[in-house]
Amino acid sequence: MEGSRPRSSLSLASSASTISSLSSLSPKKPTRAVNKIHAFGKRGNALRRDPNLPVHIRGWLHKQDSSGLRLWKRRWFVLSGHCLFYYKDSREESVLGSVLLPSYNIRPDGPGAPRGRRFTFTAEHPGMRTYVLAADTLEDLRGWLRALGRASRAEGDDYGQPRSPARPQPGEGPGGPGGPPEVSRGEEGRISESPEVTRLSRGRGRPRLLTPSPTTDLHSGLQMRRARSPDLFTPLSRPPSPLSLPRPRSAPARRPPAPSGDTAPPARPHTPLSRIDVRPPLDWGPQRQTLSRPPTPRRGPPSEAGGGKPPRSPQHWSQEPRTQAHSGSPTYLQLPPRPPGTRASMVLLPGPPLESTFHQSLETDTLLTKLCGQDRLLRRLQEEIDQKQEEKEQLEAALELTRQQLGQATREAGAPGRAWGRQRLLQDRLVSVRATLCHLTQERERVWDTYSGLEQELGTLRETLEYLLHLGSPQDRVSAQQQLWMVEDTLAGLGGPQKPPPHTEPDSPSPVLQGEESSERESLPESLELSSPRSPETDWGRPPGGDKDLASPHLGLGSPRVSRASSPEGRHLPSPQLGTKAPVARPRMSAQEQLERMRRNQECGRPFPRPTSPRLLTLGRTLSPARRQPDVEQRPVVGHSGAQKWLRSSGSWSSPRNTTPYLPTSEGHRERVLSLSQALATEASQWHRMMTGGNLDSQGDPLPGVPLPPSDPTRQETPPPRSPPVANSGSTGFSRRGSGRGGGPTPWGPAWDAGIAPPVLPQDEGAWPLRVTLLQSSF
């Protein structure tokens, strides 16, 4: 109840929707703004939405937090009446907050605003919270700015005028010339509501105070005009009056105490509804007198600025928006809200859908439909031109035959009249066919210009979709991918090899098609290559395959003609006229020649050292390039356009610049290679130890348990003369088998005799650890 509320609380200003706090110290002292101003209008304090009011616009917007990290959150916004509600999702179940738009300033942010997002705009108010919102696209931004601007201008003359916090004059109340007088401090504690809220709660508790039928008929007519015409959202043009003067923002709005016969409202409403200062677009003379109550004895003396008329308090015209907002039913707040599927406001949604992805999908579909229509028209015109061309050739042949007959008949005897008549008919028919052919050619050129424009527009659209695919939001990426697939499918259907596209080259001397070569279109980049010398930058990155375009279909994005230029069957050799103008250049190497050249360059590299042991020989034969010929063979890969791309796959040990690892084909082969590589690594490690003398004791005997490497039987010749063992000697340190601490049998089979030095290693035998490293890197 009002009696239990603290003395300092929120009060709602009537004309500007401002919030100020009442000072409990002195009624004359200017009040200060509430610190927790951002909590107003959120969740429990939000306005309750009227389901009977039409919805002007709804959609997704990004809202920036007012405090903390100022993160962006995606919310579902609905503009109903003059209030902007936002929800968590599109089901519109529980409102998260509301923004009363009259007297708000809606402005878009400039390009240099540090918002972190594009398409942002700001809704600010001198005494209220500033909302920073962002749309997804520029089209959505324009729609929201237009709708929110109309809702914010519904206040009337106060929009766009400077608002100075003027102090009340001595003869005026705190609300202006027509405001109520000052009240005492005792009344200030229990009278802290704005006139609109008090009027609303009193009218809702006692609906019998409403004006009789004339006023009700007037308000019903206003409601019908508001639902049918959007002109109510434009500012009204009328001469200024004392009521249209700006009210002080810091002055608290008070109302006089209720008359003795009136009862206090049962409870303060949960939502400050009817704060919208919407004045009906009618003259304020007799209607104001009809809609207002008679002045009470507590009202102050009339001011001089009123022109002799009784002073008008905001209590008089606060009833008008209340009747409009209630739509003839003052008890609608007690009714449960309708489910979203049965709301009448969804039917009254004006304009096209607001989803930008849906708009873009419709644009893509429309563009592809026009492109297909122009393609069919081009094909039909080409068929007619071919028929007329064939008929023209037949007529020319018939005329040639008739001319020969006439010449022969003239030499022999007099020319018959029938032959002359036939020649005349053939000539007339030939003239008619040529005229028709010229008309069809001009029509085809006109259609082709339209087709080229559509292709350019489609290329721009594909660039936009690819930009969204890489840098857009997740929803935009999904929609862009679907549209790109649709575009590629349509272009693939239009550019099939079984449908040669009709096109006449611009350099052709005759408008008529010249054979099969002129009946096919070429892409713009290929035409430019014929007229300009090819630079090394243009050749860089082109796959080996001559002049065939083996690149991906995305190369045609920037070109105007992207429909059929990607298929190699649709490509053709340049015409003789264009070929004579092109500079003579050295022919490109084919794929086979390039692969043969690469193979010769690899064979010129440093060969691997020949192993001396049988195991190394076996391993070398297993992993030699000759035995791995299937791995380096040329494999044709058929691309999407039917062309063959030549690839080369080889192990990392044979081609240092090839980063493709070698993978064994079968599990058995892999295990065999692993076992051989392990044996090779062990043997190389022991061989290195024996070469450096690290595994010999002081007598020169090998350490126990260390196997000796076998010797190559082909290299065992006449042993050199014996020599005493010398420590750290690489040539004589392997003698005296069985002396010292015998090591027992070794797993390597044959061993050297006592005193016989091992065979001398070749100079390049030290490269085997590199072979081991390369072999291990292959796995």
From Swiss-Prot:
Basic and acidic residues composition-biased segments: 184-193, 536-551, 594-603
rRNA-binding recorded as keyword: no
Biased composition regions of type Pro residues, renumbered to the chain: 704-724
Domain PH stretches: 54-153
Gene Ontology cellular-component terms listed: cytoplasm; extrinsic component of cytoplasmic side of plasma membrane; plasma membrane
Pfam families: PH
InterPro entries reported in the protein's UniProt record: PH-like_dom_sf, PH_domain, PKHA4-7_PH
Positions with biased composition (Polar residues): 315-332, 647-663
Modified residues (Phosphoserine): 164, 559
MF term (GO), any: phosphatidylinositol-3,4-bisphosphate binding
Keywords: Cytoplasm, Lipid-binding, Membrane, Phosphoprotein
Residues of the signal peptide: none
Annotated region described as Disordered, given as residue ranges: 152-352, 492-670, 691-764
Location in the cell: Cytoplasm; Membrane
Tissues expressed in: Highly expressed in melanoma. Detected at low levels in heart, skeletal muscle, kidney, liver and small intestine.
Single Gene Ontology BP annotation: positive regulation of Wnt signaling pathway, planar cell polarity pathway
SUPFAM superfamilies membership: PH domain-like
Function of the protein: Binds specifically to phosphatidylinositol 3-phosphate (PtdIns3P), but not to other phosphoinositides.
Name of the protein described by the UniProt record: Pleckstrin homology domain-containing family A member 4
Record organism: Homo sapiens
Top-level taxonomy: Eukaryota, Metazoa, Chordata, Craniata, Vertebrata
Gene: PLEKHA4
